[in-house]
């Protein structure tokens, strides 16, 4: 696999997201999923729907999310839909909670630590994906961005428990009693991300926004305020 060419701009605007996407030279085909973080209730740092409107309109995408595996405002479809409305996502976009009905299994025959991934069943409805990530810290992964979006983010509630425990359980109630060492968790994220990336067979693009960067993830209801200056926007393809 060739090294990915990564584009960078210091400009962090609605327009710069479109410009850097177009620099990639790809047109995402068919039904386009836009994977982003809807933001936990109480979190102040997630990317706002107004900020990403131009790029989502540009790719004619559907915002996709999956339910969480821990207590909060996003661990059931009913609560997650209310959160999406309160954060304004469905004011501007079609929004699909991909595991609202069920999940499906993706095999990872060459996985390093896990051999399968449980993802929202609606993933099969999409031909392409734009992974639109907010770069920030993460308590288990070190930082949360594209890798976390593809792995934890696309995983169903059961899949999130499976990745966090490196395959020990799909039961969210048993998740916190079965946490692995950090390196194994990161390897499990990489395995899960790889199978989702490969599913789209090149019809996938990545944009990472480095603004409002906190040590805490957007999944934290009580997050630290940003602790460093904004940096810019990254975009890349991995074929």
Language model region names:
Residues 2-53, 58-239:
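Extended, low-polarity segments enriched in aliphatic/aromatic residues
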């Amino acid at each position: 696999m060739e090294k990915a060419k990564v584009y960078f701009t210091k400009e962090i605007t609605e327009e710069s997201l479109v410009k850097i996407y177009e620099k990639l030279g790809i047109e995402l085909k068919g039904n386009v999923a836009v994977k982003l973080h809807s933001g936990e209730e109480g979190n102040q740092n997630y990317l706002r729907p107004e900020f990403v409107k131009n790029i989502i309109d540009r790719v004619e995408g559907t915002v996709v999310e999956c339910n969480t595996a821990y207590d909060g405002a996003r661990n059931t479809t009913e609560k997650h839909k209310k959160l999406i409305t309160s954060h304004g996502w469905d004011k501007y976009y079609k929004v699909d909670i991909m595991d609202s009905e069920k999940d499906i299994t993706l095999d990872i025959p060459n996985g390093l630590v896990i051999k399968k991934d449980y993802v929202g069943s609606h993933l099969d409805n999409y031909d392409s994906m734009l992974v639109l990530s907010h770069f920030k810290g993460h308590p288990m992964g070190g930082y949360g961005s594209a890798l976390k979006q593809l792995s934890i983010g696309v995983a169903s509630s059961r899949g999130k428990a499976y990745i966090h425990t490196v395959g020990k359980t799909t039961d969210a109630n048993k998740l916190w009693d079965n946490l692995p060492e950090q390196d194994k968790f990161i390897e499990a994220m990489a395995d899960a991300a790889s199978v989702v990336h490969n599913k789209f067979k090149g019809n996938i693009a990545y944009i990472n926004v480095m603004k409002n960067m906190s040590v805490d993830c957007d999944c934290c209801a009580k997050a630290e305020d940003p602790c460093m200056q904004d940096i810019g926007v990254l975009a890349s393809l991995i074929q």
